[in-house]
C-alpha cells in the first residue's frame, strides 16, 4: 500500500471521531464500504457524509448542516488540526478540508439528497481496518443498501477507479440485491443530473486517474482491465 494513502486513512479515522459525534451526520460512500462493511480491500481518504434527517425544510436543513460543519471545525482545531472551509456557495458550508503533518483529508456533506432509504446504524471498523489503521472507532453509518445504492450511481456518473473497484467487490460477493436495487432507483431519481446521462454516460479514459489516484490503494494488486470490465457490466 502507498504510504501517503495509509497515512491519510489513519488521519481520516481520527477526524471522523471528532465529526460524527451527535447524530447530525452519518458516513456513506467508499469509506463506509471499505472500512466498515468490507475487511479493508482498499484504503479510503475522504469522508462522504449524509444528513439523515429528511423532515426539515431545505433551508432549515442547510442551516443545520452549516452549523455542524463549523462546530466540527472548532473541535478539530482544538485538537491541533488545521481546517479550511472552501468558499461558501448558496448552500453554505458543506465541505471541510482537514490537515495535519502534511496529510489532508476532505469532508463533504451531500446536501442535495438528504435522508436515507433505510435507517442509519452504528458500526465499528472491521478487524483489518482496526489493525492496519491503529484505530478503534464506532460511528453512525448508512445502511448496506444505501451505501451500495449510492455507490452504483456514483460509479456510473463519475467512472472513478475507486468507485468501480467498490462495485467489483459487490459483484464478487452479494451482487445487486433487491434492497440495493430499490435504493439505487431512489438515489438515481434524486441525482442532480438527468437520469439518461447517468445511465448512458460517455465513457471516459480513466487511465490517468487509475495511475495517480488509485494505484497503491488496495491490499491486492488490481488491473485497470478489471475495472473497465466492471464499468461495462453496470
Where are the language model's segments positioned?
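Compositionally biased terminal segments of proteins
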Residues: 1-234
